[in-house]
């Protein structure tokens, strides 16, 4: 009980930090009237979009809430509600701050680069700490209510089902927010670039482009609210899955309650280390923005090792806590698994930066390919996107095997928990991106002096890299988290099958085998494997349609208002924002339901065909593995490849020197080819790739809930 209260106190501390940082950001200077006017357009557009998005999700949520109440229990329905509301709140509040921090960052950048960095990072840290704090509070407070308040045993089905439902609530918000926000932001970006840069020859963030405000709105709803919902879900779902595994592996043991609070204690310790880490993000004498951000991340990671040790010592201790599948599990081994999780995080960050960072081989190779035309740019971009999957996959495989050797599947779960303990700092780095991007746009549209734009460009270039790095982290943690969920599914299934007297549906299941000689297992693997590709294809098509609509709208305005190009007429910014809002909401519904319904279709489809519950459960389990494996590769390929395309385009803004020593500037044929590549890469890295993340996890969560419903 004492540990749990300490966990809740740490969750509250992160919320207090967010409130303090919000007051600090909002107290900063907003700049001149023109800057405030442009920021107002962005703020209104972002709030209008999110309000409409959450209204749509609420309608779906009400249906799911009623279904959970009828099929499971009132506690499960309330758990779903808690997960959904807190996930939405983290993204909404974070975006509420970011659309106010953008103009303040632009103004601060006119004073100094250090001031601009301070405001932008602090606004990102608000979102980060809200994600970590609200997710931890949601799980720990509800767990406390279910056990100490309602008197349920920690491993009781009422508790487990309610916590899994909480994860499902977060998942549902996440997939809608990620996909809807991605369609909006990339529809605006692609459409605006094709007409603005390629046809009209005007630079990015030029106020004459009617899609400019929509593009800046999209940065916030996609990279701030969308990423917040994504990592909130991964955080909550992975902690819940670890607790579910603890309830199965240590059922009946005296240490059960303590082991179930261990992942919560790890996350609580990491919140403290993340808050400390934020104070180390200061521009040094070398004026390296990335260096300042990495200093905060490294301090957080190093302190988290100490925090992990403290959490281990205060909860389970260093000795043996029990035997699982013939393996002696010790506190020391679990501590080592947590460190492996932190090492995996560091390696994924380094690898992703290598594949997406400017002046690195992959990005330079795409820029060089642009010199010979549009086609070679696309070919090289695709090559980099495929190559970028290898090293992260090897790191994840190494992490799985190492942790399994130390403490079995529970060790892998603890590694994922430690990875996600850093979510507060990681989300801060991500939410820093849209703020700096917007600040650059506001500086450009307000005609601030060139030296201000130079500062905002420097911040924005780093923001692009941090966004790519955090996507890599989100995918890696999602892949490992989904593996933990699969372990929870297979162990839950074994528990129900062994206790058929208490759960009549499972009384006649028989032996469930995931053997590859079973044709239903192979069929399940293939069916699961197609979901990320189909989901990604639908998402890319949606961006294409939204982008085409923006192209037509921008062309129409240029044609009907020729004074726009001369600066005599003002574009109708609101038209593009409203059009994209409707398109994104319309396009996100069907693909979002695909991973939700897939597990149900697999189970009942195979049951209908084979007449065997064992075959149906085996096919369902195999489909989950298919989603995890293919989803991991699709997501990494799309996000890293798209990030490389983006920074290859940016290489031409200051002039790219090819292998023959020729300098290619903005507006050159090579630059135009790089814009084409970036147009392909944008929906890759900001829509389809990131949206595969929640799709991987939600299929596993639905499978867990299906077991609970059938039981």
Curated annotation (Swiss-Prot):
Binding site for Ca(2+): 646, 678, 682
Keywords recorded for this protein, A-Z: Calcium, Cell inner membrane, Cell membrane, Hydrogen ion transport, Ion transport, Magnesium, Membrane, Metal-binding, Translocase, Transmembrane, Transmembrane helix, Transport
Membrane-crossing segments per the record: 1-21, 48-70, 83-103, 126-146, 164-184, 239-259, 261-281, 296-316, 331-351, 382-402, 409-429, 468-488, 520-540, 589-609, 616-636
Marked site: Determinant of potassium independence: 467
Membrane-related topology note: Multi-pass membrane protein
Site (Important for ion transport): 178, 223, 230, 686, 697
Protein localization: Cell inner membrane
Matching InterPro entries: PPase-energised_H-pump (IPR004131)
Catalytic activity: diphosphate + H2O + H(+)(in) = 2 phosphate + 2 H(+)(out)
A GO CC term attached to the entry: plasma membrane
Protein residues bound to Mg(2+) 2: 216, 219, 437
Function: Proton pump that utilizes the energy of pyrophosphate hydrolysis as the driving force for proton movement across the membrane. Generates a proton motive force.
NCBIfam families from the UniProt entry: PRK00733.1-2 (NF001951), PRK00733.3-5 (NF001960), V_PPase (TIGR01104)
Family membership: Belongs to the H(+)-translocating pyrophosphatase (TC 3.A.10) family. K(+)-insensitive subfamily.
Subunit structure: Homodimer.
PANTHER family: K(+)-INSENSITIVE PYROPHOSPHATE-ENERGIZED PROTON PUMP (PTHR31998)
Protein name: K(+)-insensitive pyrophosphate-energized proton pump
Phylogenetic placement of the source organism: Bacteria, Pseudomonadati, Pseudomonadota, Alphaproteobacteria, Hyphomicrobiales
Gene: hppA
